[in-house]
Amino acid sequence: MVMREETIKSLEDPYKYHYKEEWLNTKDPDEQQLFEIFAFGNIKDLPENIILTSLMRSKLEKLTLVTLSEIYNELSYELIKEECQIEDDGIIESHLIQLQNIFKAEMDSVSKSMKFSRRFDCRDVYCHEKELTIIKNPRVTKEYLVQNLRSWETKLKQNILE
């Protein structure tokens, strides 16, 4: 797969974590698959035939970590290593520091765990604008968000406002 320089720069940009717009706008099928993975997928979704630069791989590890932060409040380094396919604790800690504008996390190097205390951003939301070709079951969909908001609204009305 040959990637345009513009695509490589976008995927390697250390401050960019949202790729839905690129996924929607690209006409190239190979780039579309790559942007799909970066917008909605995790490192385990990456097909073996797609080779990433080290910076792109690092970005996908971080995006996978953002996904984990949306699911769990507390994580062990072992789970992070498994899900992000990272072998070194130092890389995990470096990623956590680099993601400080996405979430606030407290690291415990002794117990090799971490806790998320605040979240400032999340992954892209799939709203069925286009058919997915790589990701089978996107975690965050428009329906998922609407359901959670309705649930929260019900809880608010029943438990807090009464």
Swiss-Prot record:
<keyword id="KW-0539">Nucleus</keyword>
<dbReference type="GO" id="GO:0008180">
    <property type="term" value="C:COP9 signalosome"/>
</dbReference>
<dbReference type="GO" id="GO:0000754">
    <property type="term" value="P:adaptation of signaling pathway by response to pheromone involved in conjugation with cellular fusion"/>
</dbReference>
<dbReference type="GO" id="GO:0005634">
    <property type="term" value="C:nucleus"/>
</dbReference>
<keyword id="KW-0736">Signalosome</keyword>
<comment type="function">
    <text>Component of the COP9 signalosome (CSN) complex that acts as a regulator of the ubiquitin (Ubl) conjugation pathway by mediating the deneddylation of the cullin subunit of SCF-type E3 ubiquitin-protein ligase complexes. The CSN complex is involved in the regulation of the mating pheromone response.</text>
</comment>
<dbReference type="GO" id="GO:0005852">
    <property type="term" value="C:eukaryotic translation initiation factor 3 complex"/>
</dbReference>
<feature type="domain" description="PCI">
    <location>
        <begin position="6"/>
        <end position="118"/>
    </location>
</feature>
<dbReference type="GO" id="GO:0000338">
    <property type="term" value="P:protein deneddylation"/>
</dbReference>
<comment type="subunit">
    <text>Component of a COP9 signalosome-like (CSN) complex, composed of at least RRI1/CSN5, CSN9, RRI2/CSN10, PCI8/CSN11, CSN12 and CSI1. In the complex, it probably interacts directly with CSN12 and CSI1. Also interacts with RPN5.</text>
</comment>
<dbReference type="GO" id="GO:2000434">
    <property type="term" value="P:regulation of protein neddylation"/>
</dbReference>
<dbReference type="GO" id="GO:0000747">
    <property type="term" value="P:conjugation with cellular fusion"/>
</dbReference>
<dbReference type="InterPro" id="IPR016806">
    <property type="entry name" value="Csn9_fungi"/>
</dbReference>
<dbReference type="GO" id="GO:0002183">
    <property type="term" value="P:cytoplasmic translational initiation"/>
</dbReference>
<dbReference type="GO" id="GO:0071444">
    <property type="term" value="P:cellular response to pheromone"/>
</dbReference>
<protein>
    <recommendedName>
        <fullName>COP9 signalosome complex subunit 9</fullName>
    </recommendedName>
</protein>
<keyword id="KW-0963">Cytoplasm</keyword>
